[in-house]
UniProtKB/Swiss-Prot annotation:
Its main location: membrane. Its EC number is 7.2.1.3. It holds the Pfam family Cytochrom_B561. It is an enzyme of class 7 (translocase). This is Plasma membrane ascorbate-dependent reductase CYBRD1. Heme b 1 binds at residues 50, 115-118, 120, 180. Residues 33-47, 106-118, 180-197 are extracellular. PANTHER family: CYTOCHROME B561-RELATED, PLASMA MEMBRANE ASCORBATE-DEPENDENT REDUCTASE CYBRD1. Heme b 2 binds at residues 70, 79, 86, 159, 225. The gene is Cybrd1. It is found in: Cell membrane; Apical cell membrane. Homodimer. It comes from Mus musculus. L-ascorbate binds at residues 79, 83, 152. Plasma membrane reductase that uses cytoplasmic ascorbate as an electron donor to reduce extracellular Fe(3+) into Fe(2+). Probably functions in dietary iron absorption at the brush border of duodenal enterocytes by producing Fe(2+), the divalent form of iron that can be transported into enterocytes. It is also able to reduce extracellular monodehydro-L-ascorbate and may be involved in extracellular ascorbate regeneration by erythrocytes in blood. May also act as a ferrireductase in airway epithelial cells. May also function as a cupric transmembrane reductase.
């Protein structure tokens, strides 16, 4: 199936990938050039893993996981395969985010810095906990085959909304963290005097913001949504559970097929059904008067 507005989608996708990749490159340049590099010894070098892993995993990889269903050249792949890729990317993002938080806590322990005192830390840790919860719920409800369609119908809109909300929250948290770090480390010259590190890192923040905006735009365009697979039935709750409506859809489809195959047979079947309904009503009336 051809995608409507394919060229526009492709342009935005390439732009998002380019801006996201530049964000990762910029955060690496920041810590390697301006912040003395990376390490795992309780010093500031260990802390530097925090922005690198947060931007790479929690922002860039999570953004790709959000739009993976929108890639038109994957529409011929099975839904199970795409679910596995979506879950795998989110799992990688969660692992990198966890390691980034561990690096911060170890740095604070060694340097005797208080934990969890800033708004950045409150929002960031909350987002990580909810992100892991979202990943676990999605795994058991959507990836494993045991969940009933009615449960999936209930969870799906919550899953979509909370995923986008968490992605936006993560971007806001990263921007808060970058600004907070610059206020701490830029003393001579100070942040407000426009030092090269401050300007460079502000540019990193703008790249992250643009990447998030592109991902939000791509994932909210209805014409770029992955089409339903042939024979599938949308998960809805209005008017009964999903399983009942699936059976009803199959019955309706069968009736249409019979009509198209032989109009005479369809007419005789309709007349027979009418006679049965008449007899049934008569029989029902007799039973009600007995």
């Amino acid at each position: 199936m051809a995608m409507e507005g394919y060229r526009g989608f492709l342009g935005l996708l390439v732009s998002a990938l380019l801006v996201g990749f530049l964000s990762v490159i910029f955060v690496l340049i920041w810590v390697l050039h301006f912040r003395e590099g990376l390490g795992w010894n309780g010093s500031g070098l260990e802390f530097n893993w925090h922005p690198v892993l947060a931007v790479t995993g929690f922002v860039f990889i999570q953004g790709i996981a959000i739009i993976v269903y929108r890639l038109p050249w994957t529409w011929k792949c099975s839904k199970l395969l795409m679910k596995s890729i979506h879950a795998g990317l989110n799992a990688v993002a969660a692992i990198l985010a966890i390691i980034s938080v561990v690096a911060v806590f170890e740095y604070h322990n060694v340097q005797k810095v208080p934990h969890m005192y800033s708004l950045h830390s409150w929002v960031g840790l909350t987002a990580l906990i909810l992100y892991i919860q979202q990943l676990v719920v999605g795994f058991f409800v959507f990836l494993l085959p045991w969940a009933p369609p009615s449960l999936r119908a209930i969870v799906m809109p919550i899953h979509v909304y909370s995923g986008l909300l968490l992605f936006g929250t993560v971007i806001a948290t990263v921007l808060m963290g970058v600004t907070e770090k610059l206020f701490f480390v830029l003393k001579h010259p100070s942040y407000h005097s426009f030092p090269p590190e401050g300007v460079f890192t502000n540019t990193l923040g703008l790249l992250i913001l643009v990447f998030g905006a592109l991902i939000f735009w791509i994932v909210t365009r209805p014409q770029w949504k992955r089409p339903r697979e042939p024979g599938s039935v949308p998960l809805q709750l209005n008017g009964g559970n999903a399983e009942c409506r699936m059976e009803g859809a199959i019955a309706i489809s069968s009736a249409h097929s019979m009509d198209a195959a032989d109009p005479a047979d369809a007419e005789s079947s309709s007349e027979g059904a009418a006679r049965k309904r008449t007899l049934g009503l008569a029989d029902s009336g007799q039973r009600s008067t007995m």
